[in-house]
C-alpha cells in the first residue's frame, strides 16, 4: 500500500474536485457545498443503506470486488448483503438521523475515498478488498497506526471540504479570516460562526475543525476541551505566585 503524504492527497482531491465541477448538475452554477451522492455518481459508485451492526459501531462498508457482508434486519436477525465492488454501504440508522448529517456525509466520503485510492493504485490495493469504517477509527493522531484509514480520512476531508468552499462559507457565516482560538465558552461569537459554517457545509464540527486547522484557518482548537483556557490562566497565576 502506498504511503501518501497530505500533499499527495491534496493533489488527488483537487483533480477529483475539478471533475466534480464539470458535472452537468453543477457546471456553470455556484457550488455552496459538496454533495456526497453526486460525488459517488462521479466515480461510478452507488449507495445502499442497511443496519450494519447491533450497537452502531460499524457505519460504513465497501469493497473492490464481490463480498458478502453481514447486516441485521429490523428484528435484529443476521442476514447478508452482497457487495459488488461498486457499492458503498452505509448504516441506515445513521442515514435516518438528521442530527448526524455531517457524520453521515463524512462516512460516505470515507468509503468513497477507499474506492478512489484503489482505482488510482490498483496493484497496491488488490490485497485489501474489504473495508469497514468504525467510529473509533476516526483517529488523526501521530504516529499513524493505520495508513489505509488515515489516507481515506484525509482524502474524505479534502473532498468534502475544498479550500475555496470553506473560504466562501466563512464569508457567508460572518467569519472574518482565521479563527485564532476556537472555544465555545470563551470565544462565543467566533464559535457561533464556526457552528453555522459546519451546518452550511454539511459536515461535523470535529471534521471541520481538523480541516481548518490543517489549512491554517484555526489557531488553537479547544473544541473538545473548552475549559483549557481557564486552566492556562490558572497555571500562569500559580507560576506568578510561586515566583
Write out the residue ranges for each language-model feature:
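Active-site hotspot residues in diverse enzymes, especially metal/ion-binding acidic/histidine motifs
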Residues: 1-243
Amino acid at each position: 500500500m502506498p504511503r501518501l503524504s497530505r500533499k499527495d492527497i491534496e493533489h488527488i482531491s483537487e483533480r477529483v474536485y475539478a471533475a466534480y465541477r464539470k458535472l452537468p448538475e453543477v457546471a456553470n452554477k455556484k457550488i455552496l457545498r459538496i454533495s456526497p451522492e453526486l460525488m459517488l455518481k462521479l466515480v461510478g459508485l452507488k449507495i445502499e443503506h442497511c443496519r450494519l451492526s447491533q450497537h452502531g459501531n460499524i457505519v460504513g462498508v465497501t469493497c473492490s470486488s464481490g463480498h458478502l457482508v453481514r447486516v441485521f434486519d429490523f428484528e435484529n436477525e443476521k442476514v447478508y448483503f452482497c457487495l459488488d465492488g461498486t457499492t458503498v454501504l452505509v448504516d441506515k440508522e445513521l442515514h435516518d438521523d438528521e442530527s448526524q448529517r455531517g457524520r453521515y456525509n463524512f462516512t460516505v466520503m470515507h468509503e468513497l475515498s477507499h474506492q478512489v485510492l484503489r482505482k488510482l493504485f490498483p496493484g497496491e490495493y488488490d490485497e485489501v478488498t474489504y473495508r469497514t469504517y468504525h467510529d473509533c477509527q476516526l483517529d488523526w493522531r501521530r504516529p499513524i497506526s493505520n495508513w489505509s484509514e488515515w489516507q481515506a480520512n484525509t482524502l474524505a476531508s479534502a473532498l468534502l471540504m475544498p479550500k475555496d468552499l470553506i473560504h466562501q462559507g466563512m464569508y457567508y457565516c460572518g467569519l472574518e479570516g482565521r479563527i485564532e482560538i476556537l472555544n465555545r465558552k470563551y470565544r462565543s461569537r467566533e464559535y457561533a460562526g464556526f457552528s453555522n459554517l459546519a451546518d452550511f457545509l454539511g459536515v461535523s464540527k470535529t471534521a471541520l475543525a481538523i480541516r481548518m486547522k490543517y489549512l491554517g484557518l484555526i489557531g488553537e482548537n479547544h473544541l473538545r476541551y473548552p475549559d483549557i483556557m481557564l486552566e492556562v490562566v490558572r497555571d500562569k497565576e500559580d507560576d506568578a505566585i510561586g515566583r
